[in-house]
Regions:
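Transmembrane alpha-helices and adjacent helix-loop boundaries
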Residues: 1-222
């Protein structure tokens, strides 16, 4: 037991370095996933049929196939077509594309939940659809979308562990490398799991804090 504890202490700098990389990868994947997801949400609400179908097909593909398969096709499959990516860009692209499929549905539902009368009221005072979306609809939709988007981010933090399969040096990969040297399988994966748990717990606490702040503002707007 004492040897295992000492191993964890000695390995902690490497695990924490991997945890920082995990958070960076998650933040990048969430950012680009939100940008692309917002575009897909607008396409899903487009009055043009083919535009809606493209967005629906994209969402269906990336939500209906395993993330690990998507990462493998990007990192191991694209070189067959002359496109070679380093592990980190490949992971970022895969995580972003996958996240966008989920955030697009969240954003679309949030925007659709806003009373359509607000669109009509804004049009009656001369606002363009884009002005209405930006000034009136999105601020309200953001409140609706915050909880599910926060949950998506927490899930993404855990999903980055799949990037270890394409040699990205995030937390799980660091645990794998240490395990291969020490053969302490249970100890190292338990340590990595506890770090994931701490990150998820902190992120959940931040989510609750911001939700409470928004609810307080709604009850007592000043």
């Amino acid at each position: 037991m004492q040897e295992s504890i000492q191993l964890v202490i000695d390995s902690l700098p490497y695990l924490l370095k991997g945890a920082v990389f995990t958070l960076q990868l998650s933040i990048g994947g969430m950012f680009f996933g939100l940008v692309l997801g917002f575009l897909m949400a607008l396409m899903r609400m487009s009055p043009i049929g083919p535009v809606r179908w493209i967005a629906r097909f994209y969402t269906s593909i990336f939500r209906g196939t395993p993330l690990i398969a998507q990462l493998f096709m990007i990192y191991y499959g694209l070189p067959q077509f002359g496109i070679e990516l380093d592990p980190i860009p490949a992971a970022m692209i895969g995580l972003s594309l996958n996240t966008a499929a989920y955030t697009s549905e969240t954003l679309r539902a949030a925007i659709s939940s806003i009373d359509k009368g607000q669109w009509e009221a804004a049009a009656s005072i001369g606002m363009t659809p884009w002005q209405t979306l930006r000034r009136a609809i999105l601020p309200q939709a953001a409140r609706v979308a915050l909880p599910p988007l926060s949950n998506s981010f927490i899930s993404l933090v855990k999903d980055t562990s799949l990037a270890a399969t394409i040699q990205v040096p995030e937390l799980f990969r660091q645990a794998q490398l240490i395990t291969s040297r020490t053969l302490e399988v249970f100890t190292m994966y338990l340590a990595a799991s506890l770090i994931y748990w701490v990150m998820a717990t902190v992120l959940s606490a931040l989510q609750n804090y911001f939700e409470n702040q928004l609810n307080r503002q709604e009850r007592d707007p000043k």
